[in-house]
Amino acid sequence: MRPTLLRLANASGPLPLSVSQASVQLIPPIPLYRRLLRAHRLLPVDMRYMGDSYVKSEFRLTRTTDNPLHIIGFLSQWKMYLDEIESSLIRPDGRKQGQAVEWRGKKLDTGAFEKLSTEQVGQLYELMHATKDVWKSPEQIEREANSAGVSPVNPNDPTTAGNS
C-alpha cells in the first residue's frame, strides 16, 4: 500500500453535522450490548427478560462472524433499535420515564414486509399469534377462558398443573 493511501485510511472522518447523523454512527459491540441491556431496564419486567435473552443470544451467535458487511449490518440494526427504545422511554429533558410508559414498538413498514421471504413471513405470523395475549391483563385472559368454558391453568401453580 502506498503511503498516501495509508494516511488516508488512518484519517478520521468528518464530524457529523447534525444529531441524526451522529446517531447513525456505529457503536462498538460491547458498549452497544451494555447500552441495550441498560435500556431494557426501563421496559416492563416481562418485556425486559424477553429482550435481554434475545439480545444475549443474538450477540452470542454473531460473536464469531468475520464478514465485515454482516458485522456492520448487525451493529447498525441494533443501534437503530437502541435509538428507538431510548427515544420512546426517555424524555427530551433526559429524565427516564420508567415503568409508567409501556413501549409497544412500531408498525412494520410495508417496504420491509415486501422484502421478507416466505419463511420469514411464516415466522412473523407465528410470532403474531404467540404474542397476541401479551398486552392482556390476567383478568382479561381469565374472563376469556371462562367465557369459552375452559379453566385457565397456570403451569407454575402446583395446585392446577395436573388438572388440565
From Swiss-Prot:
Residues 136-145 have a biased composition (Basic and acidic residues). Keywords: Chaperone, Gluconeogenesis, Mitochondrion, Transit peptide. GO terms for cellular component: mitochondrial intermembrane space; mitochondrial matrix. It comes from Cryptococcus neoformans var. neoformans serotype D (strain JEC21 / ATCC MYA-565). It is found in: Mitochondrion matrix. Residues 1-51 form a transit peptide. Belongs to the complex I LYR family. SDHAF3 subfamily. InterPro entries: SDHAF3/Sdh7. Pfam families: Complex1_LYR_2. Residues 153-164 have a biased composition (Polar residues). Interacts with the iron-sulfur protein subunit within the SDH catalytic dimer. GO terms for biological process: carbon utilization; gluconeogenesis; mitochondrial respiratory chain complex II assembly; regulation of gluconeogenesis; succinate metabolic process. Residues 136-164 are annotated as: Disordered. Plays an essential role in the assembly of succinate dehydrogenase (SDH), an enzyme complex (also referred to as respiratory complex II) that is a component of both the tricarboxylic acid (TCA) cycle and the mitochondrial electron transport chain, and which couples the oxidation of succinate to fumarate with the reduction of ubiquinone (coenzyme Q) to ubiquinol. Promotes maturation of the iron-sulfur protein subunit of the SDH catalytic dimer, protecting it from the deleterious effects of oxidants. May act together with SDHAF1. This is Succinate dehydrogenase assembly factor 3, mitochondrial. Its main location: mitochondrion. PANTHER family: DC11 ACN9 HOMOLOG, SUCCINATE DEHYDROGENASE ASSEMBLY FACTOR 3, MITOCHONDRIAL. It comes from the Eukaryota.
